């Protein structure tokens, strides 16, 4: 899980979602998991 000030899609399988007010990226590739904050 990467924590970044700006989250972006890193590939076509990445999905940007909101969980508990946080913007997150979920993907089939675990390296692409990101959270804003």
From Swiss-Prot:
Q: Which GO terms describe its molecular function?
A: structural constituent of ribosome
- The answer to keyword Ribonucleoprotein applying to this record is yes
Example GO biological process: translation
Q: What domain of life does the UniProt record list for this protein's source?
A: Bacteria
Q: Which UniProt keywords apply?
A: Ribonucleoprotein, Ribosomal protein
Disulphide bridges, residue numbers: none
In terms of Pfam families, this protein maps to: Ribosomal_L36
* HAMAP family noted in UniProt: Ribosomal_bL36
What family name appears in the similarity comment? Answer: Belongs to the bacterial ribosomal protein bL36 family.
Name of the protein in question: Large ribosomal subunit protein bL36
Say which species the protein is native to: Gloeothece citriformis (strain PCC 7424)
